[in-house]
Curated annotation (Swiss-Prot):
InterPro entries the record matches: Chorismate_II_sf, Chorismate_mutase-related, CM_dom_sf, CM_II_prokaryot, Isochorismate_pyruvate-lyase
EC assignment: 5.4.99.67
Major enzyme class: isomerase
Name of the molecule in the record: 4-amino-4-deoxychorismate mutase
Gene name linked to the record: cmlD
Length: 103
């Protein structure tokens, strides 16, 4: 195999992993929508600081256990959590408006 072919094969493998990563992020957001609906129906506050800490701590432990940069994974989860909170807030606001409209 030529060096160029090897590079193309490696990039194709990376592209496949990127597809899996993006699909996983989409699935995580979809699950966040379901969680937001549950929270809205059961009066659970959107922000759960204990849960946020647990998720970030788990990312840091994973990084340490697998030789990855802890700050990178914690920062990555900061971005993911920020987006999840934004989505949950939107969903819960809509759920609240829908409930008020039914009265």
């Amino acid at each position: 195999m030529t060096e160029q072919n090897e590079l193309q094969r490696l990039r194709a493998e990376l592209d496949a992993l990127d597809g899996t990563l993006l699909d996983t992020v989409r699935r995580r957001i979809d699950l966040g929508v379901r969680i937001a609906r549950y929270k809205s129906r059961h009066g659970v506050p959107m922000m759960q600081p204990g849960r946020v800490s647990l998720v970030k701590d788990r990312a840091a432990r994973y990084a340490a256990d697998h030789g990855l940069d802890e700050s990178f994974l914690v920062n990555l989860y900061d971005v993911i959590i920020t987006e999840m909170c934004r989505v949950e807030d939107l969903v819960m606001s809509r759920e609240s408006l829908t409930a008020e409209d039914r009265r």
